Amino acid sequence: KEVYRHLLERGERMYSESIGEKRMRIAALLEELEAALQQEQPQHIREVFRRVKSALDEWEADAVSFFS
């Protein structure tokens, strides 16, 4: 689905802009989402999608508040 592709692209962008532990955590989340998509189990995909989206949202919010 397109929503999953957009989340992967967003995560890849954040990965390329990050360093250290945050970068490693983003990589692990993206790998988990890609694995879920390959398994093609809708319930599992939705759970992983929510977890990845929540983490990326939180990190972006932290970055925005840091620069505000």
Per-segment meaning from a language model:
Residues K1-S68:
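PAZ/PAZ-like end-binding module
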